[in-house]
Amino acid sequence: MHVKAETVLALLTPGLPSVVGQHVVDLSGDGWTLSSTALDRTVPGHLPSQVHLDLFEAGVINITASMILTFVGLLMPIGRIPATRLKACDLENFESTWLVFDGLDTFTTITFCDQHVGSTDNQFRQYHFDVSQILKECKQDPVIRINFGSAPSIANAIAKSPDAEEWPPGVQITNEYPNRWYIRKEQSDFGWDWGPAFAPVGPWKPSYIVQNNHAELYVLNTDLDFYRQGQINYLPPDQSQPWIVNASIDILGPVPWKPSMSIEIKDAATGSVLSSGLLQNVTVSGNSITGTTTIDGDAPKLWWPSGMGEQNLYNVTVTVQNDKKKSLAKVTKRTGFRTIFLNQRNITDDQLAQGIAPGANWHFEINGHAFYAKGSNIIPPDAFWPRVTQARMARLFDAVTAGNQNMLRVWASGAYLHDFIYDLADEKGILLWSEFQFSDALYPVNDAFLENVAAEVVYNVRRVNHHPSLALWAGGNEIESLMLPMVKRADPTGYSKYVGEYEKLYISLILPLVYENTRSITYSPSSTTEGYLYVNLSAPVPMAERYSNTTPGSYYGDTDYYNYDTSVSFDYNHYPVGRFANEFGFHSMPSLQTWQQAVDPEDLHFNSSVVMLRNHHYTAGGLFTDNFKNSSKGMGEMTMGVEAYYPIPSKSDSVANFSAWCHATQLFQADMYKSQIQFYRRGSGMPERQLGSLYWQLEDIWQAPTWAGIEYDGRWKVLHYVARDIYQPIIVSPFWNYTTGRLEVYVTSDLWEPAQGTVNLTWVDLSGKTIANNAGTPETVNFTVGALNTTNIYTTNISELSLPDLKDSILILSLSGEGRLPNTSSKKAFVHQNHFTPVFPKDLSLKDPKLEISYSPESRKFTVQATGGVSLYTWLDYPAGAVGYFEENAFVLLPGVQKEVSFAAQEGNVTDDWVRRVTVQSLWDQKVRD
């Protein structure tokens, strides 16, 4: 058959591994159709895509209206009827022809030339089908048809089947669509408390036709593992040992007789060759060919996370040859040399002697160095993955590094991240704590389910293992810390059964699969855990979890903390004391500008039905489109947080009042996170030796009230600015016990060497005048803070200070210090500013700061000054037309100080008109009635 040019969407792309003579057709692009026999409707289709997106583009459903609705799937026929994609193709004859699908969401039957090819039932797996014989016998134009089933309907059918596993009532968590735990699909597609329940279907990743002649091979997947000689996943690697490179390639095609493998490793920046030659100990197992080599331990330049050194990367090319030295397959991957280790080992005698409390460690070590993990949790950035572009993720990751974050927890259950997202993380130095896609549920453990999961685990572990940004594999989200206690309360007598099922899936199945495919990554069975008692890889349950076998006064594992009782939001005695904080937070509203993207003007008020229905905290718990009762609880929590601590907005204009309320919820959220992050970072020098803070959550999936610090279009909330500030390397922090009046000031550093400097403590009233005798507080305190440590520099009680009026007082803390960033040769200066008020913001005797703002085209900076009083929470806001962030925001500004602030534009144009519409406000504006 002759290949028609118009039918070949794109010949071999640079990212496709191939050999000369191989024919690969990338099926991405237009030319597909989306059909429904039930509706008798056909519209143009695309690949990759999902059904909703093609229907949006075809005008069948309205994207704006549909995105407002809570349950699009209930109101449109999407997901209830089979969706079929067709692609006409006319291909030349080759010895073998394969269909390769990198991702089908989720339940499909596939035909080619009207012949059944196969079926799929896992969104997270790569599938390939041999259609050689079908093509040879095909008498018509070959056509690919992919029939997609409704995931909610199929999940319900599985749940109703006689052999379906059941759990005690009240244990399984339904957000909107039920029964998500029976299927291997993105769990949040069925609804979550921060996003919609669209349950999309479609070919969400690329697909290919692969044709080979003779002994040609197509590379399906590649597992490159870089580790120190002798390294074992759960033990600290010996940094003095040479590097072992293990290259394993999964192929399509006949495995050659006595294959050989060669490798070339080049510096990605300079092109210089680090190593080249034949791999040793080449073995064949199934369709995988594997070989190893050794590299001198000091030869490669190490890869470091952001803030700890350079992100040195290498291009690694692996070639497979037959016994005649003919090249059969070649693949190139970009990688880096690093060790990353999650230390869960028992506290040693040396650590006890240093004042660290007994128990077990729970922290990360990069290239042998313990470090403080600063970051957040990333959720799916869109309800439809085909809309997630490289440019969009680059913008998001720019915000991550600009926010002084070095780690993201890739939450389950979204989806395993695309390779290009790991590539971006490699470049920017962002560690990605990755998880298998199980969350807040108990899962089946029948043979078919476990077999499906095993293939999913092996494929994804091998696929992303070469990325130096990969930091951890965790079994799932909150399974040990939430689900096991829930089932214990629901069925105490059957608890041991469910613990056994948990161990069967996450320890007996997944752990060995991870260890068999990587030596370089640690595995934890659950995101939040008390750690393990011991590891015995030859045992049926190779890791003995600690569970509740803890000792009072000892600390184990990481913490997960949410408390919606706003009366204790700033009482740090309620915060958990542990080794690492992997989740904590509180929700807030997005900005007015973001609401205007999705909501009609008449709905822009706090308790409008549309605003309330887009708030999924708390979720409906089922298929209801009138979730006002549960939503009102979450809306009420935000309201109570504002009313307890901040001036209550009361604008005469309804839209302005709505905007002020949105901003007020962000102030509460940001201050609450700041309070916790300061507390956790201070823990680095406390007995708990706390070495990680990952707040919930980084970004939004749509325009709605959520825990996010970055809104759907990339606009930063107050939270992300405040987190950026408090994640600086050296910070000064006040800790106030508002019950006893005790005030402590600490300096905290995450540098790897001691740092020195001074902190100026200055009391002023809210007009900006200094308070006499500095209220009895020393004006300057010198400090020395140890590596990864904290030190108390000042302690007092508010009752002992000579403050004329607590409501008219603010303490300005200004740090100036010197230290050395990791892997740098010279010291640098560090500055940080914080503040403290002896009453909550709502009780302050605020003065109008009379803010003024100007812009210099020459310096491209805004200048802000207060001419009337102290400006608290000084907030620069920008209009639509560009996306980016200010160099600093939500800061305290004293009268007479001119502060220059630049704007980093990530998208759009900063025009003269745009600049004129940039505004500035403060806490004063929140209480003023226009």
Curated annotation (Swiss-Prot):
Location in or out of the cell: Secreted
EC top class, as a word: hydrolase
Record's catalysed reaction(s): Hydrolysis of terminal, non-reducing beta-D-mannose residues in beta-D-mannosides
Glycosylation site positions: 62, 246, 281, 315, 346, 536, 607, 630, 657, 737, 760, 782, 789, 797, 823, 909
One Gene Ontology cellular component: extracellular region
Gene3D superfamilies registered for this protein in UniProt: Galactose-binding domain-like (2.60.120.260), Glycosidases (3.20.20.80), Immunoglobulins (2.60.40.10)
InterPro entries in alphabetical order: Beta-gal/glucu_dom_sf, Beta-mannosidase-like_N2, Beta-mannosidase_GH2, Beta-mannosidase_Ig, Galactose-bd-like_sf, Glyco_hydro_2_Ig-like, Glycoside_hydrolase_SF, Ig-like_fold
Gene Ontology MF terms in the entry: beta-mannosidase activity
UniProt entry keywords in alphabetical sequence: Carbohydrate metabolism, Glycoprotein, Glycosidase, Hydrolase, Polysaccharide degradation, Secreted, Signal
Function (record text): Exoglycosidase that cleaves the single beta-linked mannose residue from the non-reducing end of beta-mannosidic oligosaccharides of various complexity and length. Involved in the degradation of polymeric mannan and galactomannan.
Name of the protein: Beta-mannosidase A
This protein's encoding gene: mndA
